[in-house]
Amino acid sequence: GVSSTALLVSVLRRFGANPRFAVPRRSEDGYGLSSSAIDRALEPGRPDLFIALDCGTNSYEEVAYLRSRGIDVIVVDHHRSKEKHLEDGILINPHVHAAPGDAAWHNLCTVGLVFKLMHGLLKRLRSENNPAAFRIKLRDYLDFAAMGTIADLVPLQGENRILARHGLRMLQQTQRPGLRALMRVAGVKPTQGILPVDISFRLGPRINASGRLADAALSVELLLNEDDGFCNETALQLDAFNRERQDIERQITEEAERLVESHYANDHGIVLYGDNWHPGVVGIVAGRVSRKYNRPCVVLGNEGEMAKGSGRSVDGINLVEVLGTCCEHLSNWGGHPMAVGIALAKEHIDTFRAQFSEAVRRYVGGDIAEQELALSAWLPVEHIRERLMDELESLHPFGQANPEPIFGIHGV
């Protein structure tokens, strides 16, 4: 969402537009295109066009509300549709409009879709001889596209691989003050090359930290701002948020693992709730717990009368399909096969816990298989030469659906 907003706003500004942007605050608005987030976005005045990024596919009532006020709506999103399609507005979503599974753009995340949307806009305006359209080079925004693509853990295949590979090169030579300041505080040295791991574990967590603990708009401002002083100060602030996030995450993870060991070790799908758990970091905790115990996990935090949180899955278990069979007590939910956000009344947690575990059991048809170490190949020792290293280098960038090869060697 952050990289998508930065890319879209940057390009529109080059056309002389001055778009407002608003980022939902998790603590106040929850996830996605909520009514409170919309009201806050409309406070400065009614726009002619409202563009929802990385949310909105399932926001039927919210989009209808915007349309009722005479506002055109474009939804650019890659989350799965749960029941029906949007009846109002324009929806750009490759998972809704029957895209062939092998299409090069099928698994684009939202920033990739925004990149394509801007590509289409430039082509259209160039055909109309718009002078600004000829001055804008979309490759200058590949750094934003790469960051969002890698951080969102979409398969690095097809067009995602192209965006990531060329975007990483652009990121190495970026002159954006915000990105350069962020690299400095994160210890990323562009002169030594930038890898996906630098985004996943250094830059991405700092960009996301403000949204988890405060306001994600701060990260968007960092990416857009041209003032070195502001960018240096903001990068330090994001770094501080990230350190705070790590401390909170560590504490909740320890508590969550104790709960699993004492109460839910035999559940096929794990649902955990903590009254003092920060909703902004429970998704990371869910990922850690699911990896440790090799089963889907939902971790919930306290938000008034509601419990809100995130779920993470393991290979072979589609969380969207699982939740579709046990969602009767969920007031809101949605996401991807491997990651979802949910909300429900606290009184329904125990019932949902039992239903979720049973739904996972039915989905896998019994017990979840233990994960195995998947070797890419067995290699004779004499094949490990500089040429092999060069060939492996050509396979970069490694990431989701393009993992770094693991080789086995006999008789070492």
Give residue ranges: language-model regions.
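Two-component system phosphotransfer/interaction surface
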Residues: 118-119, 346-361
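A short acidic, often aromatic-flanked loop/helix-cap motif at beta-alpha or helix-coil junctions
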Residues: 28, 97-102, 382-384
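A short acidic, amphipathic alpha-helical/loop segment
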Residues: 61-65, 270, 285, 391
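Active-site cavity-forming subdomains of large catalytic enzyme subunits
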Residues: 39, 43-107, 111-128, 132, ...
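Hydrophobic, well-ordered secondary-structure segments
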Residues: 5, 60, 111, 115-118, ...
